Swiss-Prot record:
Disordered: region residues: 187-217
Species per Swiss-Prot/TrEMBL record: Thermosipho africanus (strain TCF52B)
UniProt name for this protein: Large ribosomal subunit protein bL25
This protein's record includes keyword Calcium: no
Assembly: Part of the 50S ribosomal subunit; part of the 5S rRNA/L5/L18/L25 subcomplex. Contacts the 5S rRNA. Binds to the 5S rRNA independently of L5 and L18.
CDD domains: Ribosomal_L25_TL5_CTC
InterPro entries (alphabetical): Rbsml_bL25/Gln-tRNA_synth_N, Ribosomal_bL25/Gln-tRNA_synth, Ribosomal_bL25_b-dom, Ribosomal_bL25_C, Ribosomal_bL25_long, Ribosomal_L25_dom, Ribosomal_uL5_bac-type
Role summary: This is one of the proteins that binds to the 5S RNA in the ribosome where it forms part of the central protuberance.
Amino acid sequence: MEKHTLEALVRSVVGKKRAVRRLRRQGFVPGVVYGPDVEPLSISIKRSNLIKLFHEVTEASIISLTVKDENGKEVFSHDVFIKNVQYDKLTDEVKHVDFYAPEKGHKMKINLPLEFVGKAKGEEKGGVLEIHHHELPVETLPNAVVEKLEIDVSNLDLGQALYVKDLKLPEGMEAELDEEEIIAIVSTPSGLEVEEETGEEESAEPEVIEKGKKEEE
């Protein structure tokens, strides 16, 4: 699994709106990193680096975070995950980021991205592949995390569904959804059903006529 890197600075002034606004004007985004064995640490990240990172990662991506003080000395280094991102309602700019530093052997909850590959059998017959979940909430050990879960749908026929219980999750990872929850299904368009029914009726009609002829004879 690819590991991404990010550098941050210790944020000494915390909770003061004026200081936070000044920080943002300077091109930085305030954030915090915390975990089971990590005391909350206030940090600031260069906005351009953060935006670049967001284009490369998901909630399930491991990020190697290094935090330095104002003198450039490293004060913290840990593998982290993005836990929460706050956006400005008007400008949609990133306002704050929470990073979670997991403890080895300690389970955590994330949303695992699902990637569907292949073309379902049912699609070739006119069906439509409906995706009910693009992410799967899971509880997992840090070493079991994958950036995404690939799901092959090529064997799904008309009317067939893929359930949570059908997914092959890494050892140490458990789905938070009911095992009977539908992940994806190949639905049959109503027009296709009508055509099939009409075809059955047409094939049955000659038999009736044939019987009528025999009775007349």
